[in-house]
Amino acid sequence: MKPIRYTQEMVDEFLKDGYWTRELFYDFWERNARELGDQEALVDSKYRVTWAEAKKLVDAIAYTWVQMDIPQSSRIIIQSPNSVYGFLARIAAERAGLISLTVYPYLRERELTYMVEKTEAVAVVILNEYRNFNYLEMYRDLQKKFPHLEKIFLFDDEVPQGAPEGTYSLTQLAKAAAEKPIDEDALKARRLDPIGNIALLTTTSGTTGIPKLVEWPTAPRICTSKGRVDIWGLTNKDTTMAIAPHAGGAAGTLTYFAAPIAGAKTVMLEEFDPEAALALIEKEKATAIGVVPTHLVRMLEVDASKYDLSSLRFIRSAGGYLSPQIAEEAETAFGANITSDLGTQDMGSVSGCRVEDSKDLRRRTVGRMLPGNKVRLLDKDTNEPVADGEPGVLYFRGPHAPAGYYRDEELTSTVFDPKGWTTTGDIVKFDQECLWILGRAKDMIIRGGQNIYPAEIEGLLNDHPKVASVAVVGYPDREMGERTCAYVISKGGQAFSFEEMVEFLKGKKLAMYKLPERLEVVAEFPAVGDSGKVNKETLKKEIAAKVERGE
């Protein structure tokens, strides 16, 4: 199946400049098996697998799927918690010439109905049960709706009685096939083109609750992963750890995509518990962990001094806003730098901080542009380039971007222009060669003709000792057009007044017109889907309704 967006000119450019290669992710697993064969590759609570063993199991799974006559480029859905076999299934799909879609364990029939139908998936890989939910029953029901979903592979060692026809134990199939010769020619015949074939699908978070699907060949993903290996300084001496689900970017970018390129080991925490996470870091001497901000908050509630975390080198936090205050507390408690970066599933990776960058750069910026990315800063209203040093809407193009939305050329064309330029919608400025995020173009507040960037106010308020998190939004006003409201979650439920907020911001020398004119102290923020990102559209509607009611 061919990608829908790349032109021959783009392909030639990225190949000529060395950003795209003819490599697949499997090639790095094969190299690691050859050069680091006895070194551990994957670890969970049940299995410890070396690179040599991992390659053998991957080949066995892939060859089994080929022998089952699953057609090349068929779609296969992998829904698993963090596990060794979850990783093996993902790379085996690529090896067998299949297109994998790895999804979060918490997705249920509503979301999966869309995905199974949209992808015409022929197989799924799941646990029978997990966290008191029966996945096999759910997919049995989906099979009744979609006859093309012919096969179910279980991570369990046994197939339960009464399972639908076409249900297999993946672990037993893999172990049996690993004892027999593999037809290498049959697998080579299924090799995907790293540029010309879709290899994997990813999901986006959205306000509708139904994720969109994004298609990727391996070339841009490998390009980004090599960039991450460089800025994180990953080597085959590192031990990465998935605390967040490997299906998402927070942990998946670090552990599934980047670690094998470096030859680094990956340890998996199957189910999050703050004590268990810290204990596993100590036990496995993890050097890098992938988390979402909520994980850090909960880990800070534990006495970290009970654990030896001296091995930890850096923390990759993504998938939601991490306040500077929480970042400071986490770095102090865990003794590791927290990195920041910019990217989306829809548009690809833009930039990133190096682990050794100063605290100010890691807190306040999203780092330098990744190799090969080109950037333009345009005026929000005129679309003309802004003067050097001035803020503008970020537009970029480069070798890190996906092919587009799966089987949706029309939607893809609304995000990428014919030459590959796209925008995250962020208003940014360049300083010290780094991107400083000032806010989203759609979130910028225009008060009496003056621009107010929410991120600037949020960054200042997050330094207040009573503030745990803050979101700044605009609301309609007849006189000024818009005014500013600060939504605040106070630390420990402390009282926090409007007067305290204003005095604090005045002390920070904030211009008078930027001072919020309303304060709403709340217990939590609405989120965009399951991403953990603050849904500012909901907050805007809420405050606009309050103002209209005269509250």
Locate predicted features.
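Conserved AMP-binding/adenylation subdomain of ANL enzymes
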Residues: 222-239, 247-288, 302
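Conserved AMP-binding A3 loop
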Residues: 50-53, 190-191, 199-223
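AMP-binding/adenylate-forming catalytic core of the ANL superfamily
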Residues: 107-117, 124-126, 289, 398, ...
